[in-house]
């Protein structure tokens, strides 16, 4: 072609920096070289826009291969090729290569993808499998990665023309592919449009711009395709082998994990076994330690016992000194107490005079007001409740403090008087409604005996003949009880008048008096309970405390009935309630009763209490019901008839019912109580059943052998109740009470009760001298004490000998040896054995060269007192070695025990059996067996 073509432009217009590097063709050249005609054809094609039509014609001439599914590869966001800043790639069209199967294979980057578009169906299937395997491998193992498409190349098999690849000066291969005839054409930013005039100038650079010769050699293509297929098959096999290896590796890992888990479980089992063995060893060690601790505790107890014995000896010496000091303190306290009484009497007398003057002035004012005003019927005063007349609602019963302050009571009285004087001008009431001032002043005068409780109430001192603080309080409570009884009788008269003709002044005063008296009674009950729990009392003191607690409780019930009746003026009820109560005022319980034996000397007395104006009609008689107490709770006895006389008539005058009980059946060692009930009716009302509180517990036995266990059950219930532990003083007082009943002694004049030394012996021997007695220690004590009490009650002459002091009773072996150490030969002493419950032991003195063997002890056996006609005195009389007996007496001045020796026949002769004396058997010694 000539260089005179007007469309050719010189290549000098191209930038001088454009470097062209001729790239060697990948395949051998077939003699085809790119010419200027080819470039002209390309430019003509671009200018005429017929490239698309020619492309379609060429596609119609060539057989269309059946399209195969191609794997979807991620397309880059930008179709622009990436160029080096120093180079520019120029792509041209080469005719005859656009439809060649190797037209896209000239690029090394897109070789694999172009081959897939030109192979047959089998090759396509293999390639698809390969791509699928590659995708699976990419998803699961991340081993193989699909070859990304070439930068700037669109993977579209329908594009008929493609530009060959040129190589820039850097040696990098780039490919620019675009659809001819489309609206948008990707143009290199450095590419300049070449027209026909410039084609001749481009010939100068043909030698440098040698395109890659693409040879359409079927043999080379087929060999290359087979080689690529073989490589793909190898890759697939390698991938399959890799997957199999991975699966095997996973299986091995799972097996390894299972083995580790199995080993871990075995280790855990071994650890558990080791822990169990360690626990067993620890338990064995703990058991050994407990045994050692028990042994040490036993040794410590023995040491403590020895130490306590020494302390007791020292305490006895200190006690004498302490008594002397207390005697002086008691005298001072008594003087202070008398001074307080005198001062209080003076204050009360002054208050009484002031109250009388105020009442007289008030009565005069009321009388003048009533004369000036017309009289009104009395019923009009009751139509409106007093609540509307009073400025303040009356006081109710409040919790009771332990101490009573007389000054507070006097202030209340003064306040009441002030209210009366202030309200006297209202003109309420009439001359007939005025209460006599003497009655009100007498009620107030009864409160003059209110005494504050002394601060030394909690001092724990043993009882004696010296007047002690708790004895003073008991005496004061006795005086208050008599004064309160008189006060209740006068209060009944006043309340009748108040209910008949209500006045707010007298109502307020009477309500305050009832509240004050209720507080005083509760304070007395509290102080007596504290005395019982703090001091070891003598039998007369025990009797007084029991009597006062019972009487004060009845007074409290009567006062509550009065108060309830008085409050009906403020809170009327329709129909009016039945204000009545049934109480037991006398009872011999707690005690053990023998079946079918009447209680002639110890009757049970029941009294009916009511209000001041309550008119009751007694319907029927009083009925006694036995309530059995067991572990399941209280329930009525199922026996058809357990009491011989269950129903008794009540005296209408005194409203008393007296029972001489006789029980026909035993209670099977279970404690029981009695309740009494009857029907009463208010005039104009309906009948109402009222019932008394239960009596103290008792047990009915059928044989004397049941006494020991039954009395122990009663003592335990009477002492502890629902408590796990109680003070020693309270327990000693309950024990003394049961002991006196068992030995049939009078509380006020006992002949031989448990002395202070005997109680100290019991406290130390069985309870370790602890201030609090646990309920768990009771059974072991009663096993020993109960058998001795059984013998004292039922064995012939034993109880009489006890009361006469011929049986010392509760004393240790060491104390017996000390008592006999300075006595003559043949002197003996009777006591209860410490190791053999219910047996007597005789300690006596003999003539022995060894001083340690001169005091001996003999245990009285059952055969020694066997038979109806052989008693303990008879056994002692038959022993010639027993000549003198030590008799126990109590010093009246100090309360200390004293022993005096008497010839046994002098003191025991009244107890000897009257029978013929048999001659002694010759050749045999009657000396008792030496222990």
Curated annotation (Swiss-Prot):
Residues 52-63, 111-144, 404-430 have a biased composition (Low complexity). InterPro entries: EF-hand_12, p53-like_TF_DNA-bd_sf, RHD_DNA_bind_dom_sf, SH2, SH2_dom_sf, STAT, STAT_TF_coiled-coil, STAT_TF_homologue_coiled-coil. Residues 802-931 form the SH2 domain. The modification Phosphotyrosine is found at residue 924. One of its GO terms (molecular function) is identical protein binding. Induction: Up-regulated in response to hyperosmotic shock. It holds the Pfam family EF-hand_12. It is found in: Cytoplasm; Nucleus. The keyword DNA-binding applies. Gene3D superfamilies: EF-hand (1.10.238.10), Rel homology domain (RHD), DNA-binding domain (2.60.40.340), SH2 domain (3.30.505.10), STAT, domain 1 (1.20.58.240). Residues 504-554 are annotated as: Mediates nuclear export. Keywords: Coiled coil, Cytoplasm, DNA-binding, Nucleus, Phosphoprotein, SH2 domain, Transcription, Transcription regulation. One of its GO terms (biological process) is regulation of cell population proliferation. Residues 1-83, 98-151, 304-340, 396-430 are annotated as: Disordered. Disruption phenotype: Cells display abnormal regulation of gene expression and aberrant timing of development. Colonies growing on a bacterial lawn are smaller, have a rough edge and are surrounded by satellite fruiting bodies. GO terms for cellular component: cytoplasm; cytosol; nucleus. Tyrosine phosphorylated in response to the chlorinated hexaphenone DIF. Minimally phosphorylated in the absence of DIF. Phosphorylation increases during development, is highest during the slug stage, with a strong decrease at culmination. Residues 662-706 bind DNA. Monomer, in the absence of tyrosine phosphorylation. Homodimer, or heterodimer with another family member, when tyrosine phosphorylated. Transcription factor that regulates gene expression during development. May play a role in regulating gene expression in response to osmotic stress. This is Signal transducer and activator of transcription C. The lineage of its organism: Eukaryota, Amoebozoa, Evosea, Eumycetozoa, Dictyostelia.
């Amino acid at each position: 072609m000539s260089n005179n073509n007007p469309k050719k432009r010189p290549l000098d217009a191209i930038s001088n920096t454009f470097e062209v590097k001729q790239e060697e063709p990948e395949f051998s050249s077939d003699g085809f070289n790119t010419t200027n005609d080819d470039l002209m054809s390309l430019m003509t094609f671009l200018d005429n826009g017929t490239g698309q039509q020619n492309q379609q014609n060429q596609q119609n001439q060539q057989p269309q291969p059946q399209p195969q599914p191609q794997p979807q590869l991620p397309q880059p966001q930008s179709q622009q090729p990436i160029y080096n800043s120093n180079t520019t790639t120029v792509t041209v069209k080469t005719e005859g290569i656009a439809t060649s199967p190797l037209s896209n294979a000239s690029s090394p980057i897109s070789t694999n993808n172009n081959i897939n578009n030109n192979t047959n169906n089998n090759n396509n299937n293999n390639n698809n499998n390969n791509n699928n395997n590659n995708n699976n491998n990419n998803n699961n193992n991340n081993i193989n990665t699909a070859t990304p498409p070439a930068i700037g190349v669109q993977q579209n098999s329908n594009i008929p023309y493609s530009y060959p690849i040129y190589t820039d000066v850097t040696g990098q291969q780039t490919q620019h592919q675009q659809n001819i005839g489309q609206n948008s054409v990707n143009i290199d930013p450095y590419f300049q449009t070449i027209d026909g005039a410039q084609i001749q100038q481009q010939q100068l650079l043909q030698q440098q711009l040698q395109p890659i010769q693409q040879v359409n050699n079927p043999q080379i293509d087929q060999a290359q395709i087979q080689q690529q297929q073989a490589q793909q098959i190898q890759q697939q096999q390698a991938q399959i082998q890799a997957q199999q290896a991975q699966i095997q590796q996973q299986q091995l890992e799972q097996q390894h994990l299972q083995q580790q888990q199995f080993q871990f479980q075995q280790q855990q089992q071994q650890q558990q076994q080791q822990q169990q063995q360690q626990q067993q060893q620890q338990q064995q060690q703990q058991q050994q330690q407990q045994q050692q601790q028990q042994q040490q505790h036993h040794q410590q107890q023995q040491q403590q016992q020895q130490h306590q014995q020494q302390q007791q000896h020292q305490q006895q010496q200190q006690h004498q000194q302490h008594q002397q000091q207390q005697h002086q303190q008691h005298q001072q306290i008594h003087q202070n107490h008398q001074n307080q009484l005198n001062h209080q009497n003076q204050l009360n007398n002054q208050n009484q005079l002031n109250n009388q003057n105020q009442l007289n002035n008030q009565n005069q004012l009321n009388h003048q007001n009533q004369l000036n005003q017309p009289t009104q019927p009395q019923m009009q005063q009751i139509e409106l409740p007093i609540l509307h007349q009073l400025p303040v609602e009356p006081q109710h019963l409040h919790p009771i403090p332990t101490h009573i302050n007389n000054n507070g009571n006097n202030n209340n009285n003064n306040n009441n008087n002030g209210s009366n004087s202030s309200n006297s001008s209202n003109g309420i009431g009439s001359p007939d409604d005025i209460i006599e001032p003497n009655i009100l002043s007498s009620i107030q005068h009864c409160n003059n005996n209110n005494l504050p409780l002394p601060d030394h109430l909690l001092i724990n001192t043993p009882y004696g003949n010296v007047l002690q603080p708790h004895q003073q309080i008991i005496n004061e409570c006795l005086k208050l009880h008599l004064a309160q009884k008189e006060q209740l009788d006068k209060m009944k008269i006043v309340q009748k008048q108040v209910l008949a003709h209500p006045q707010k002044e007298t109502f307020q005063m009477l309500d305050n008096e009832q509240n004050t008296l209720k507080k005083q009674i509760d304070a007395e009950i509290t102080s007596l309970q504290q005395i019982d729990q703090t001091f070891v009392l003598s039998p007369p003191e025990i009797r007084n405390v029991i009597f006062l607690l019972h009487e004060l409780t009845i007074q409290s019930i009567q006062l509550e009935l009065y108060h309830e009746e008085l409050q009906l003026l403020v809170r009327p009820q329709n129909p009016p309630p039945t204000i009545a109560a049934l109480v037991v005022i006398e009872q011999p319980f707690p005690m053990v009763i023998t079946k079918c034996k009447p209680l002639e000397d110890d009757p049970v007395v029941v009294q009916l209490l009511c209000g001041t104006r309550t008119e009751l009609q007694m319907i029927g008689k009083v009925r006694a019901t036995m309530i059995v107490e067991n572990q399941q709770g209280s329930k009525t006895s199922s026996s058809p008839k357990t009491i011989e006389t269950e129903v008794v008539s009540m005296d209408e005058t005194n409203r008393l019912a007296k029972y001489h009980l006789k029980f026909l059946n035993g209670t099977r060692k279970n404690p029981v109580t009695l309740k009494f009930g009857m029907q009463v009716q208010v005039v104009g009302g309906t009948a109402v059943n009222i019932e008394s509180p239960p009596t103290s517990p008792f047990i009915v036995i059928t044989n004397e052998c049941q006494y020991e266990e039954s009395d122990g059950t009663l003592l335990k219930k009477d002492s502890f109740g629902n408590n796990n532990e109680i003070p020693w003083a309270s327990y000693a007082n309950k024990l003394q009470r049961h002991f006196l009943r068992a030995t049939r002694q009078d509380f006020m004049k006992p002949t031989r009760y448990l002395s202070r030394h005997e109680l100290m012996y019991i406290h130390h021997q069985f309870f370790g001298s602890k201030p609090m007695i646990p309920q768990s220690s009771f059974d072991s004590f009663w096993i020993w004490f109960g058998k001795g009490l059984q013998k004292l009650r039922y064995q012939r002459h034993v109880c009489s000998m006890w009361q006469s002091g011929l049986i010392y009773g509760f004393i240790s072996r060491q104390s017996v040896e000390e008592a006999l150490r300075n006595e003559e030969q043949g002197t003996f002493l009777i006591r209860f054995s410490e190791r053999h419950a219910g047996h007597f032991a005789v300690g006596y003195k003999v003539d022995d060269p060894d001083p340690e063997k001169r005091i001996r002890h003999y245990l009285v056996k059952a055969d020694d007192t066997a038979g109806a006609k052989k008693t303990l005195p008879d056994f002692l009389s038959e022993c010639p070695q027993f000549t003198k007996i030590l008799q126990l007496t109590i010093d009246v001045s100090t309360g200390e025990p004293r022993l005096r020796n008497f010839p046994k026949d002098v003191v025991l002769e009244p107890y000897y059996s009257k029978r013929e004396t048999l001659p002694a058997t010759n050749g045999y010694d009657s000396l008792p067996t030496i222990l």
